[in-house]
């Protein structure tokens, strides 16, 4: 146990943690040079394409240190993006230390800061490392000072390395051995193992990644999952050296996988504790806090017969992604589907892409909404995450919208642009601190504004230098209303949205104009209206196609023409009463893209 080191790497997107982990694997000989592939740990296609890490992965390496001892390094890779902070806290719960990797050219970013504080709250030892020193713009001295200034940990003797060229990687390994404490735990106590992650394998069933806190787990042991109380047998246990390698037992302090042939997807929830079936532990380990979804959207399969496959896909995906929440929903316009809760917009995109890719589904998503707190005139408080569930205006005493505290780090030359953006998004400034070249600004912003397109616009106004990290703080009263779209007087439930009253005219006009372009012309006029309650605020009409009925009258009498035109008019009127309009899929998608 003295020779085990469990650690993870905290870093901002693009600061090089996946490359650094590649180097560590190479130096310790986890894979031969032939098998070495760039970003070994980013195993999902999506992760490679977008160049981001989404899922936590783990690797066990043997490293022969300079003091002659062989150390077992258990390295758990973590994502850097703010939407996946939950994955990060899970990875950190299994470690005793973390490497804080910072790009020596760019300096500290807001999400790194947030994850670093998470690590310090969990009492982990954080070891700073300056990466990318091979770049011409690298300035390790300035960045080291910045780490001390902003994060508040000692960084003057931080290791300088370049994961790309391999300079200083040996020193990184030595620092891990020297500065990160070995795991604590009692090998003779009853087994307690924390499930860090689970995923579904079509051949093996559920595979769980676990960290043994106390005791040990042998192959063939009967264990039970503490939250469900079910017993299972460990068919295989082992470690990843990135490849799956079987072992006979996992000892205290180790990180490895357990396969018990579980078919039931929710049999091993993430954050749960495993213990032995006979004389097991009394209490479960403190897990992770359950995260609440922040953004909800309705997701519907394009063809209704895909509904069953969609449900199975969601079940499998939710095993792997513990923060996903879903419940069935039906819509008169789109049929049956699910209402899915996400942590943020990137999470939403990734989930939708994974569903479409890994499970071959074709999906359509309604506009994302946040959860509103509604106080009714009867005095009760309800939480609404779907605009069409909002009660009638005269029953609402007060609407409250969720407010987030956003911490933005931005180079000072872009500060003005960022402040303008925050004011436009109805934000209030709380704090501003200068750290050398960077400014840390804190704003309270309505979450609805943040989830729409705030992140993209923040990046574009600051040329990509600003970074953002936000968390929910409270509900505030706000003048929010539901904007309905009516087509020929009928509400289309999938197009309803909740927005601020100051915004309705602008939004309503934009919406009806967009819809007018997309709804195909019929034989009768189609009225498209945007309404709040019973008040119509914008309207446009898709004109009818009409036949030239007077074409066969040569010269002729005007009363003859009038008769024909009136007859046509009557017919159109009758059609309008019975005709109904199909809203094409493109129209729904266009509404979502309207913010852009």
Curated annotation (Swiss-Prot):
GO MF annotation list: GTP binding; GTPase activity; guanosine tetraphosphate binding; ribosome binding; translation elongation factor activity
HAMAP family: LepA (MF_00071)
SMART domains xrefs: EFG_C (SM00838)
Species whose genome carries this gene: Shewanella baltica (strain OS155 / ATCC BAA-1091)
Subcellular location: Cell inner membrane
PANTHER family associated with the record: TRANSLATION FACTOR GUF1 HOMOLOG, CHLOROPLASTIC, TRANSLATION FACTOR GUF1-RELATED
EC numbers for this chain: 3.6.5.n1
Gene assigned in the entry: lepA
Keywords: Cell inner membrane, Cell membrane, GTP-binding, Hydrolase, Membrane, Nucleotide-binding, Protein biosynthesis
Topological relation to the membrane, as annotated: Peripheral membrane protein
Name of the protein in question: Elongation factor 4
Recorded catalytic activity of this chain's protein: GTP + H2O = GDP + phosphate + H(+)
Cited function: Required for accurate and efficient protein synthesis under certain stress conditions. May act as a fidelity factor of the translation reaction, by catalyzing a one-codon backward translocation of tRNAs on improperly translocated ribosomes. Back-translocation proceeds from a post-translocation (POST) complex to a pre-translocation (PRE) complex, thus giving elongation factor G a second chance to translocate the tRNAs correctly. Binds to ribosomes in a GTP-dependent manner.
Short name of one Pfam family: EFG_C
């Amino acid at each position: 146990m003295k020779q085990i080191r469990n650690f993870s790497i905290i870093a901002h997107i693009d600061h090089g943690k996946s490359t650094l982990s590649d180097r560590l694997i190479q130096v310790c000989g986890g894979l031969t040079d032939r098998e070495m592939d760039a970003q070994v740990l980013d195993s999902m296609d999506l992760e490679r394409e977008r160049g981001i890490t989404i899922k936590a992965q783990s690797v066990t390496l043997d490293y022969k240190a300079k003091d002659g001892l062989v150390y077992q390094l258990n390295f758990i890779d973590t994502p850097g993006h703010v939407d996946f902070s939950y994955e990060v806290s899970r990875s950190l719960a299994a470690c005793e230390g973390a490497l804080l990797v910072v790009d020596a050219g760019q300096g500290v970013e807001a999400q790194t800061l947030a994850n670093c504080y998470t690590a310090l709250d969990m009492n982990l030892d954080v070891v700073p490392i300056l990466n990318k020193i091979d770049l011409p713009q690298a300035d390790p001295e300035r960045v080291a000072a910045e780490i001390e200034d902003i994060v508040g940990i000692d960084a003057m003797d931080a290791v300088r390395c370049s994961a790309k060229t391999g300079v200083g990687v040996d020193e990184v390994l030595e620092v891990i051995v020297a500065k990160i404490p070995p795991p604590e735990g009692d090998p003779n106590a009853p087994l307690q193992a924390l499930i860090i992650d689970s995923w579904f394998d079509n051949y093996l069933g559920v595979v769980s990644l676990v960290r043994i806190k106390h005791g040990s787990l042998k192959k063939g042991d009967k264990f039970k999952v503490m939250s469900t109380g079910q017993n299972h047998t460990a068919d295989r246990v082992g470690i990843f050296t990135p490849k799956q390698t079987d072992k006979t037992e996992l000892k205290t302090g180790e990180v490895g996988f357990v396969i018990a042939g579980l078919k039931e997807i929710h049999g091993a929830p993430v954050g749960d504790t495993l213990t032995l079936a006979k004389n097991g532990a009394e209490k479960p380990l403190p897990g992770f806090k359950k995260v609440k979804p922040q953004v909800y959207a309705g997701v519907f399969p394009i063809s209704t017969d895909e509904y069953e496959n969609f449900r199975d896909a969601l079940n499998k995906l939710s095993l792997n992604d513990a923060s996903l929440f879903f419940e069935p929903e039906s819509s008169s316009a789109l049929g049956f589907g699910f209402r899915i809760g996400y942590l943020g917009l990137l999470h939403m995109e990734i989930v939708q892409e994974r569903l479409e890719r890994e499970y071959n589904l074709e999906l359509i998503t309604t506009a994302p909404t946040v959860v509103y707190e509604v106080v009714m005139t009867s005095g009760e408080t309800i939480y609404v995450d779907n605009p069409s569930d909002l009660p009638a205006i005269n029953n609402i005493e007060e609407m409250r919208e969720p407010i987030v505290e956003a911490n933005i780090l931005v180079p000072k030359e872009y500060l003005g642009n960022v402040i303008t953006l925050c004011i436009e998004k109805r934000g209030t400034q709380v704090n501003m601190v200068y750290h050398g070249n960077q400014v840390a600004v804190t704003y309270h912003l309505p979450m609805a504004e943040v989830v729409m397109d705030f992140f993209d616009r923040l990046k574009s106004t600051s040329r990509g230098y600003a970074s953002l990290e936000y968390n929910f703080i409270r509900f505030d009263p706000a003048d929010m209303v539901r904007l309905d779209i009516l087509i020929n007087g009928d509400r289309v439930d999938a197009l309803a949205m909740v927005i601020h009253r100051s915004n309705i005219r602008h939004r309503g006009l934009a919406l009806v104009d967009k819809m007018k372009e997309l709804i195909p012309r019929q034989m009768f006029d189609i009225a498209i209206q945007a309404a709040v309650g019973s008040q119509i605020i914008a309207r446009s009409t898709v004109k009818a196609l009409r036949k030239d009925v007077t074409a066969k009258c040569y010269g002729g009498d005007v009363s003859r023409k009038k008769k024909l035109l009136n007859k046509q008019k009557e017919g159109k009127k009758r059609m309008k009463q019975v005709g109904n309009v199909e809203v094409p899929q493109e129209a729904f998608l266009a509404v979502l893209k309207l913010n852009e």
